[in-house]
Amino acid sequence: MKHNLLLLAVAAIFSTSANAADINVAVAANFTAPMKELSAMYEKETGNKILASYGATGAFYAQIKNGAPYQVLFAADAKTPAKIVKEGLGVEGTNKAYAFGKLVLWSAAPDFVKEDKNFILSDKVKKIAVANPKLAPYGEAAYQTMTAWGNLKNAEPKFVTGDNIGKTFQYAKTANAQVGFVALSQVFKDGKMTSGSGWIIPTDLYQPIRQDVVVLNPGKGNKEVADFLKFVETNPQAKKLIESYGYGL
């Protein structure tokens, strides 16, 4: 009897393995919340599990160069996926836009942020969280915005700099800075701020934050990887979910 139960258990394990597959995905920090929901939707629909790691695109690039077994990268920019393909680390022709990010000046304090370009220079704002523009596209967009406003030089002494947009958001969230230039997706859902107060920066003040996905060499020819990317790109519910976090498509 015990032998039969063991055989049934082993059969069940192999059956599950045959019907489901794990997909290793590296995801830019700004896309954390949407990816968690997309993963849950996809797993429910297919049984395939998304094993997502979240962090800085630059850090993922370094890991990928060192042989990390990620199959897909959802980057915070378009430059990194293009570089990955050029260097032979990714599959040619698979890098494409999955979302366009938006910048917001945000504070954890309700009714604090004013829609005024000189607000960041006011005495109310002691520290401003900004991502490193050399490492993070949202940091680059913040610098472009303040350059357009003409107040970058005066604002710089107030900067608290994060290596990526995740750390930058934490600075603003924990009041290490009164305000921060962060990704709209970190503080926005279904048409409104989820907490605090913010000013969605007009998109004509900075270059479009195009975010590309790319299939990495470990994911080449993998049917489950291709199916997941098709789901993200074409499924109406998936597209609606991404837009609900303030992204453009």
Name what the model sees in each region.
Residues 1-19:
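Gram-negative bacterial Sec-dependent N-terminal signal peptides
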Residues 93:
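Active-site phosphate-binding/coordination module
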Residues 20-45, 51-53, 58, 62-68, ...:
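Exported/periplasmic ABC-transporter solute-binding proteins
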